[in-house]
């Protein structure tokens, strides 16, 4: 009886903690909204019928049946972006002048303006991006090597901006400096971890980013293969050490903890290894990466969420960095690589958890906020074309339109890309072009439907 009471108490405490970490979702889900709008409930894929085209713009849905965002919602987003950019620029006057990172520093702001240039075509944003990246290139620390938290970010972003401005000499100089870090990355004797924020996967992203943004061959195949090989050998080594070679051939840890999520964990590493630009051979993907993903899949909570680490049994965090919003991306990539429906099905289950528990009290940011959670819906929409996920993304964007009105926690770096306002602006701008949206400093190409 005591054990039963303990379980009940734990259950109720869990529910209370969920409420403490997120706001109850006030929005009706897509089926109810579509039904209220006079459209067929559910997606066309689920019912096998094509939804009728409305003759007038429907005030209840933020997009047309063809997926194009309706003008009044576009206007609301554009107005909010302008407002938030003004607040952000004012706030950045007191930001840490030495933080050059993409995560919380100037490179993240450069990435935001690069994104706004991509969405609008306005050259002013590209030049603003250049202003910010120039600051970072003058202050490289030489201490960290990744895209998000190290020198690889400023150098890769600088190379792309200079390339877009047709300053090829400066662009190549950035690439050369980036590749000078290569020896440190591939050295197995180094203490370098493998995760995205501070490890090899974060450097790999920088190389793949250049080949995606500038063009194939910008970084040679050999350099990429050597980084991939170092990541794989490291994963095999820990797996042997932990005696998990058969169950999880590629095992990773950060600070002696086997994290699951996208930022510090296996989801982020597996996701990078499955990128087509990483050119990992099919045998390695099938024999090493796939069973490792399946091992992590089996750690899923009954709710559909995932633990922050393999040893953690508490269903608490629904963030991109820890939980379903990060794992969903590896499941979607696995579905594309291995063509097995189970991965898509579980990605959809992740989406349901994010819809229920993803409006976070931590704020509106990308790493552990509502914007980062909203990107999971955009990724699922691009792959499936199911309007349900576009609707969910739009509703999370609608929440962000009331930035600051919900009583969320104020982050340590309130104007930054991954913790603060810049991230929300990035997400809102991607809602304007959902077909080409991508999670910054993480997603590379665009998910395509088979």
Swiss-Prot record:
GO terms for biological process: carbohydrate metabolic process; negative regulation of DNA-templated transcription; peptide modification; positive regulation of abscisic acid-activated signaling pathway. Disulfide bonds: none annotated. The modification Phosphotyrosine is found at residue 198. It is found in: Nucleus; Cytoplasm; Cell membrane. A lipid is attached at residue 2 (N-myristoyl glycine). Keywords: Cell membrane, Cytoplasm, Lipoprotein, Membrane, Myristate, Nucleus, Phosphoprotein. GO terms for cellular component: cortical actin cytoskeleton; cytosol; nucleoplasm; nucleus; plasma membrane. The keyword DNA damage does not apply. Its main location: nucleus. Interacts with an array of inositol phospholipids such as phosphatidylinositol 3-phosphate (PI3P), phosphatidylinositol 4-phosphate (PI4P) and phosphatidylinositol 5-phosphate (PI5P). PIP-binding enhances membrane association. Necessary for abscisic acid (ABA) binding on the cell membrane and activation of the ABA signaling pathway in granulocytes. Belongs to the LanC-like protein family. This is LanC-like protein 2.
